[in-house]
A protein has these predicted regions:
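N-terminal strand-loop-strand
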Residues: 2-45
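Residues that scaffold the ATP/ADP-binding catalytic core of kinase and kinase-like folds
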Residues: 27, 53, 145
Length: 168
């Protein structure tokens, strides 16, 4: 049995994509490895791994494009801190090929400057589908849409980016 304390966190970036109406993009995960069936906790904002030596802002824009097809976005700001979460014990040693105990994430707020028709969940060749549906959600409902172990991260990101959402 792998002990979480023996494993590192996976370095990641996340994007809170905010539209003109002050709503936030969320995608419904195509695979639901972390959400028990029937819970509805299948939604999340775009996020993904930070490659070694990669600039975090560039990684955030890359992940946004890979997962949503969106290129019409501008960065508004980033969180003051990295946010970490631990996987539930039952997933440690299996998720991400057993290499990580969870993720530590730097988040970016971005303004969506395109049209909804730009959003394309079809993956590029060589990539796996991240989301099979999407919607614009109010920022206040985000914590209830994600798996419970990510909720504190989302609450922190919301606190830091609330002024971007309300300033739209």
């Amino acid at each position: 049995m792998t002990l979480a304390a023996d494993l590192p966190y996976r370095l990641c970036v996340g994007v809170m994509l905010i539209n003109r109406d002050g709503h936030v993009f969320v995608g419904k995960r195509a695979d639901v490895p972390f959400a028990p069936e029937g819970t509805g906790h299948w939604w999340q904002m775009p996020q993904g791994g930070l490659d070694e030596g990669e600039d975090p802002e560039a990684a955030a824009l890359r992940e946004l494009e890979e997962e949503t097809g969106v290129t019409s976005a501008s960065i508004l700001g980033r969180t003051r801190q990295w946010y970490s979460y631990d996987l539930p014990q039952g997933l440690v040693g299996t998720a991400w090929h057993g290499r990580y105990r969870g993720q530590t994430q730097l988040w970016f707020a971005a303004r969506f400057e395109g049209q909804d028709s730009e959003i394309d969940l079809e993956p590029k060749p060589g990539y796996e589908r991240e989301f099979d549906a999407w919607k614009w959600a109010s920022y206040g409902e985000l914590p209830d849409l994600v798996v419970p172990f990510k909720r504190p991260v989302y609450e922190g990101v919301i606190r830091e980016f609330e002024h971007f959402v309300l300033g739209t």
